[in-house]
Amino acid sequence: MKGKISSKTIYDTIKDQIHKERFPQGSMLPAELTLAQKYLVSRPTIAKVYNQLQDEGLVQKTKGLGTIVTHQHSNTTYTFGLLLPGAGESEIFSIINDQLLSQSEAGSFNCLWEGATAGSAEIRKMLIESYCESYINKKVDGIFFSPLERVQDADELNLKICTAIQDAGIPLVLIDRNIRISPERCAFDVVSVDNFNAGSVMAKHLLDQGCEELHFFYRPDSASSIDLRISGIRDMVEKQGRLFTANNLFCGNPEDLEFVKKMKITSGKTGIICANDSTAAVLMSSLDALGVEICSDVLICGYDDMKYSKHLKHSLTSFRQPCEEIANISIELLMRRLKDNNRFPITINLAGEIVIRESSQFL
């Protein structure tokens, strides 16, 4: 049997909710009887709590009306920690990072950025835990985290980091991707591009260009968002009455010519969708070395619309993510969590757009 909740615990809870604007100035606190029933305590216990809050100038009890919050909030400046390790590999995280920093200058929060943006995924893995621990020790008000990818045991490490932040009672918003805990419900807010739609859009584009068979190429230990893109591709291909099976999935190093050779390419009828632009750029070079002509034998495209994409030998068709909006909505969700960190988790998927270039058009 659970122990009786003390009046101090109830007092601390209500006071915290007032300070976090769960009960903003001018709002009514729950009736004493309602709160007594919620906490399974007597009505005089709640009356004692409300009297203490009134003595501190946080509320005003009015007979026949109720208890009104009178506390006027000051312009609190929050401190948020950034854990965006992908900024060392992809431009999208640099854009998201810059937007968060830009908004911090104009908003009511400051950002701590410890980095972990090294080009090597393994180095980022070594750094990320210490940065997370640093943020927790500094008692930041919230954390933005883009889960690690491209390293072994990334799933376990991501879950470990999220759990540590959660146990510290710090609000957390995941950016760009979820952590792999399916089929369990994710306990955190997530903001990303709509990856299922991104897969569907790219598949439809290549099919419309005359491709009769599509392949998907990605590197080992890629992010969970890859699964959603694959699902979107499969859905679109099957809607067109064609097959997309495990034989169309290639997980490996795009520099490995022997592995690249395993892809069945029917000249003028094959399209390759890569997990990102960096994979596509390397794969284009490998295909060229094998005598496979882009725009003649095969079409190819990627994701993230990196700056160099339009400067490749064959300018690369890509999918542009709404990076600045991802950052903006992430801030909104973290501010929401500051008011009540127990709110039901939200997943927001934003629309991106395809940027069509030479690499996805047969000549």
Residue ranges and their predicted role:
Residues Q25-S27, E213, F244-N248, E293-L299:
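Short acidic capping loops at alpha-helix termini that bridge into adjacent secondary structure
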Residues E91-G107, A198-V201, S224-L243, V282-S286:
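Short, solvent-exposed amphipathic alpha-helices that sit
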Residues S200-R242, I346-Q361:
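An alpha-beta-alpha
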Residues E105-A121, H215-F216, R234-D256:
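Short beta-strand elements in bilobed, periplasmic/extracellular small-molecule ligand-binding domains
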